[in-house]
Amino acid sequence: EWFGNNITTNEVADMWVHEGFTNYSETIFTTHHYGKDAGNEYVQGTRKLVQNDLPIIGKYGVNEEGSGDMYYKGGNLVHLIKQLFNDDEKFRMALREMNKRFYHATTTSAAVEQFWSEQLKRDLSPLFDQYLRSTKIPTLEIQKNGNKIKYRWSDCNSNFNIPIRVFVDGQTKWLEPITEWKEFTLKEKISTIEPDKNFFVGFAVLQ
């Protein structure tokens, strides 16, 4: 609640900024006291509470909040952003900068979204549109054929293009899927491929 009283929004439709980051503070607390793995398991465990009933952002100008998913889905969105940094310290510093930038301010989701795009030096609007303005959770689809892998995003907005960390036979690899098929080839036949569970996405291996 400290976070929400420090930074909040001027429209209840954007209350995910207040509630999502406040929810994620529980993950930060768990990580600090019990370790990174425990923090990851905690935030992943909250996904079972996500309903995907309505978009997180409500209708503007009519005093309407979005879905209650602003808490747990919002927290998982923040955790996903952390993964895109691929550097825990840089993410921590960005969080501190956010608290400086918007200190004791009433702001908007759009301003916060722009802030995180600036911090990552990447247009995150496809990410925010997907998780805040849609009820769909993207699915990473994979097709394996020997030493070749085809991959794409499905069940998502047409412009969704967020990178994801996967493990190919236990080795870390970053993919940059879009909604059209892409492909990569390794020297040897691929046995297993799976996404990092810290990304709140679905996963399907197609035949």
For every predicted segment, state its role.
Residues 1-156, 171:
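Hydrophobic alpha-helical and helix-loop surface patches within well-folded domains
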Residues 94-102, 177, 184, 204:
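Compositionally biased, low-hydrophobicity segments enriched in charged and small polar residues
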Residues 197-207:
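Short acidic/polar inter-strand loop motif in beta-rich domains
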Residues 124-125, 140, 144-198:
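Beta-strand-rich binding/interaction modules
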